[in-house]
Design a protein with these regions (language model features):
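Flexible "cap/lid" loop of the alpha/beta hydrolase fold
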Residues: 120-123, 130-174
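A conserved amphipathic alpha-helix that caps or lines the catalytic cleft of carbohydrate-
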Residues: 56, 97, 121-122
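Active-site loop/oxyanion-hole signature of alpha/beta-hydrolase fold enzymes
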Residues: 19-22, 27, 33, 67-109, ...
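Conserved HGGG/HGGXW glycine-rich cap/lid loop of the alpha/beta-hydrolase fold
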Residues: 25-78
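Core-facing hydrophobic residues within beta-strands of well-ordered domains
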Residues: 103, 128-129
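Conserved G/P- and acidic residue-centered "switch" motifs that form tight phosphate/ATP-binding loops
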Residues: 72, 114, 131
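Gly/Ala-rich beta-loop-alpha elbow adjacent to hydrolase catalytic centers
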Residues: 110, 114, 118
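Alpha/beta-hydrolase fold catalytic core
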Residues: 1-39, 60-64, 101-104, 139-140, ...
Length: 178
């Protein structure tokens, strides 16, 4: 058994929920309270719901918190495709909210990519989001249409290199170089 160096203060509950042909892993803290909107926390790219443990432990108010692992991350199934589309994240979130909260409004917190998804979702379903917290979710990088062909060509080349097993990660001399 792996022992954590961090002393967890509020233990989460884990469960799996069928969402859009995937077995979604969802972590929860606290108990549902009809007087307090649930807090839904969505993580960023290459992250997991357990990363919110530090935030949950720092909260002084006991409340119901729902944090899924996005498709392909953590313990949630990986779809049978090699890409992830933002509309899928929006739909997954909508189905998860149907399952857990029905027509109740929520407080929605997203970090990084999750912040971008949360902001998009609040725009698509404003009636479901009572409060929005966006942590470092700056959105997609700004590019010009004229850059598209070159960016796609580079992406295809990198994809082929990866599939051949020849992808080398770029080394950095120090933190400044990153």
């Amino acid at each position: 058994m792996i022992q954590s160096m961090y002393p967890i203060q509020k233990v989460s509950r884990s469960e799996f929920v069928p969402i859009r042909q995937l077995n979604y892993h969802v972590r929860q803290w606290g108990t549902p309270d009809k007087n307090i909107p649930p807090l839904v926390m969505v993580h960023g790219w290459m992250d997991v719901s357990a990363s919110f443990q530090f935030v949950v432990d720092a909260m002084t108010q006991d409340r119901w918190i729902i944090a899924p692992d996005w498709r392909g991350f953590g313990l949630t199934d990986t779809p049978n495709q090699d890409n992830y589309w933002f509309p899928d994240y929006l739909a997954d979130l909508d189905f998860l909210l149907d399952h857990y909260v029905g027509d109740r409004s929520i407080h929605l917190l997203g970090h990084s990519m999750g912040g971008h998804v949360a902001t998009l979702y609040a725009g698509v379903r404003p009636e479901r989001v009572d409060k929005l917290i966006n942590l470092e979710g700056f959105g997609m990088a700004a590019t010009r249409p004229a850059q598209a062909a070159g960016r796609y060509a580079k992406w295809i080349d990198e994809l082929k290199t990866m599939h051949k097993g020849e992808l080398d990660l770029k080394p950095y001399a120090d933190l400044e170089g990153v």
